[in-house]
From Swiss-Prot:
Reactions it catalyzes: L-citrulline + L-aspartate + ATP = 2-(N(omega)-L-arginino)succinate + AMP + diphosphate + H(+)
UniProt: ATP binding residues: 10-18, 119
GO BP terms, alphabetized: argininosuccinate metabolic process; L-arginine biosynthetic process; urea cycle
Encoding gene per record: argG
Protein name: Argininosuccinate synthase
Amino acid sequence: MGRAKKVVLAYSGGVDTSVCIPYLKHEWGVESVVALAVDLGQGAELEAIQAKALRAGAEQSLVREAVQALITDYAFPAIQANALYEQRYPLSTALARPLIAKLLVEVAEEVGADAVAHGCTGKGNDQVRFDLAIAALNPQLKVLAPAREWGMTREETIAYGERYGIPMPVQKSSPYSIDLNILGRSAEAGILEDADREPPEEVYALTRPISQTPDEPAYVEIEFEQGIPVGLDGQRLGPKALFEQLNSLAGLHGVGRIDMIENRLVGIKSREIYECPALMVLIQAHRELESLTLTRDVIHYKYGIETTYSQLIYNGLWYSPLREALDAFIRATQKSVTGVVRMRLHKGQAVCVGRRSPYSLYNPELATYGEGDQFDHRAAEGFIYIWGLPTRVWAQVHRG
């Protein structure tokens, strides 16, 4: 008896997910495989991927467009949260996984499948993200993960696919594992596994090397409404157009490269290369606008929330009650995060050079050291005495 009758497979057209189709049918006795490819702005020829799944043995090959949903339902909340895993990674790949899982569950329910499947291995984070998201959305569905169990080396996996007539795109001269969507691009494996070796330029695709960036900086004004980016340089833009334009501009100036040693949930460290031009600029600009419009206490408290929020996304807990509760807090903080931030993009750096908001808490008459100073300097002495009183009493007791 097979492990399932009908399975919906998250399909990318790569080695592992392509091999999953014959493996599910011939090794695990699955009667029918429905391949689901999701358009996340990766720029792939989805018609070719759709046809490849059918050649590999899928009974159906479906494509779902989800670029808009990825940005509005996943990236925008992350921007409001200034979400950076370990203070560096803006979660471009991790944010896409709960969306793919949601679509897997929806299609499985539509076609009457009793299981869903993915091509994640047993060493990565994505297996956790898929399994937990699917369980949260439909705990009755089985989750199959052939690549986690089949025990084949990369070479054996390729050979298995070739046995069933599946063309393999990975070449020995380019052995990187790539993930791409409109939020960013990740690369790992190959020579990148040498943590002490500088990544070759061929690893990058969205950003220019510093030597090839323009000598003159570019300036861009980003408009936010309640923490959501809505326009560039005075022009209102939809989410997709905004990301496309900012990815192009920031990438041209070499902005958004990340080379980091990352702590995976499964307990290992991994060397990851990310390119997230627009997402990094937006998070930085958003934080600058918050500095202008939020109170000190809210900003300082939100730092801890942002760290937890980022960890939840990274660790596959997007659909958890805690993430939803934190979202409620974050949304409440964003009511006044409306305004415009001016960023300078130059030689790999994005620097804020101006910010304005109708809800600005910055008061020049209180901040100035020149004429027009309205700060009551006489109040400082009493404030300092009361503020330091506990320390003063402690010192009297312990130091005489």
